[in-house]
């Protein structure tokens, strides 16, 4: 999915919040929040498993896919945003 802007009579048509969120992930934004990545992963069918034993690392699982573990810290490191970007790109090509 490519970010887009539509021009209508000289003014910009606002992208939806969802499109903006995907655009930020695809551009590997440095200010992503855990809940934003969670929202995207869950929308693609991943299920979040809560950590045990006081850990801050949440694991997202989906049948037939490699689990993704993301720590709940701010800001989210680029490595974890790249993991979610790969999910988006693989889902969009299906």
Please place each PLM-identified region on the residue numbering.
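Basic/aromatic recognition patch in beta-strand/loop cores that engages polyanionic ligands
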Residues: 38-76
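Intrinsically disordered, low-complexity and often Lys/Arg-enriched segments
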Residues: 1-15, 90-94
């Amino acid at each position: 999915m490519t970010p887009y802007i539509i021009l209508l009579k000289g003014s910009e048509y606002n992208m939806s919040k969802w499109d903006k969120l995907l655009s930020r992930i695809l551009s590997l934004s440095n200010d992503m929040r855990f809940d934003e990545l969670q929202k995207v992963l869950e929308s693609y069918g991943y299920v979040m498993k809560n950590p045990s034993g006081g850990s801050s690392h949440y694991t997202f699982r989906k049948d037939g896919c490699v689990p993704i573990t993301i720590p709940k810290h701010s800001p989210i490191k680029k490595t974890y945003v790249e993991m979610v970007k790969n999910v988006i790109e693989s889902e969009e090509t299906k």
